[in-house]
Amino acid sequence: METARGRVLSVASECVPLLKTGGLADVVGALPGALAAEGWEMRVLMPCYRPLKWRLEEMEEVFAEEDLFGGPGRVMAGEVAGRKMLLLDAPHLYDREGGPYAGPDGDWGDNAQRFAALSWIGARIAREGLGDGWRPDVVHAHDWQAGFTPAYMNYWGSGGASSVLTVHNIAFQGWAPASLLSALRLPPQEFHPAALEYYGGLSSLKAGLVSADHITTVSPTYACELMRPEFGMGLQGVIAQRAGQVTGILNGVDTDIWSPEVEERPYDAESLKAKAENRAVLSGAFKLSVPGPLAILVSRLTYQKGIDLIPEVLPDFIAAGGGLAVLGTGDAPLEAAMRELEVRFPGRVGVRIGYDEGLSHLMFAGGDAVLVPSRFEPCGLTQMYGLRYGAIPVVALTGGLADTIINANPAAMAAGCATGLTFHPTEPPAFAEALRRLIHLYADPAAWETVQRNAMRHPVGWETSAAAYAALYRELVA
């Protein structure tokens, strides 16, 4: 590892292996190690939720804050699984039953204060550093939960640190009523459309977008999409005004964890024999007998993910010999629709409602194809897992899906570079046609194996992404 050439404070609401509700945690957890290889030292600041309280016994207090939006707080430092972590211990904000963002009755009513506190501490560390003399050159805030961080740095001082805001999913914007402006320690004179005001209220994400020195999103295509009304979700104008400071950088995946070579029945691009063994085990787990391609769906079951399209396109796919194994949870009507397909097509469709990390690994190892029909997808990790395991991705042409999959059209097949199948628009006819192409490809074993091997050789690790972030940091601190 190179000697650290810079210091970065990552401010986020979740991070593996401490806590995960979605892909954000994977990214935040992967960046420190990936950036270390580029010579950057990253520390991660996140809230100390109730399930993490026990870790405080192994950590040291860095500093305290007497009045942290309604009560005292303290920052605790320690190392977790090789990551230098800073946990914000503020019991009045984080020590409660339920998830990090919501309780049994919905979103926590004080989420604005809870995550303003996280941002406030991030900005304080930028200004004052830590007790050991560590002070960041760059503060990297993630999504709405850390969106106020660049704003606080602007209004209360940054200590010379630069700020980056990464938009992982613009659908979540951190809205709060304007009446909280002063309580959130934001200057009233900045409550106007060019700054903090957002449709009569506040948005922590908008505050970050107008305040950060640079904005990143999690794929180049998503960076462009966010400037269009159908994807920007009300913030397209804000982002378009800052187009010169917006960069799309694809996420990567942890290739040590997500690797067919470390599974129970290992295989690689040079020897695919054990993939058939995994397929047999997967078929047994879901009680399936599928003569054609066995597709998998590992996803949140939501409209955004295009799950409502599955019942419309699946009958023809089944009739042509295909099958489907589903793992996911989400909207009740879509969960019910998946169960109905299982009843309608016994032995050809299997469904597990919920999430099981071990089962998901088996599904990628045994699946012939993975379906990702998202209406929008900022980056997407599922298709990258598919590439890694030779489960050929069938994806909608949007966001990170468009940036990671090379469509198996005649030109790409002739050039020997195809890695999957894409379709556009995200509607049943186009999706159904992509599945027909999948059936046709599967019927040609040589062509199928070529695409499989191409997919498995496609780089999906963090090396390229980390280099891009490191280049951005260097530019900001130059």
Swiss-Prot record:
Pathway: Glycan biosynthesis; glycogen biosynthesis. Gene3D superfamilies: Glycogen Phosphorylase B. GO terms for molecular function: alpha-1,4-glucan glucosyltransferase (ADP-glucose donor) activity; alpha-1,4-glucan glucosyltransferase (UDP-glucose donor) activity. It comes from the Bacteria. Its EC number is 2.4.1.21. This is Glycogen synthase. ADP-alpha-D-glucose binds at K20. Pfam families: Glyco_trans_1_4, Glyco_transf_5. Synthesizes alpha-1,4-glucan chains using ADP-glucose. It comes from Cereibacter sphaeroides (strain ATCC 17023 / DSM 158 / JCM 6121 / CCUG 31486 / LMG 2827 / NBRC 12203 / NCIMB 8253 / ATH 2.4.1.) (Rhodobacter sphaeroides). GO terms for cellular component: cytosol. Transmembrane segments: none annotated. Keywords: Glycogen biosynthesis, Glycosyltransferase, Transferase. Belongs to the glycosyltransferase 1 family. Bacterial/plant glycogen synthase subfamily. It catalyses: [(1->4)-alpha-D-glucosyl](n) + ADP-alpha-D-glucose = [(1->4)-alpha-D-glucosyl](n+1) + ADP + H(+). The gene is glgA. GO terms for biological process: glycogen biosynthetic process. Disulfide bonds: none annotated.
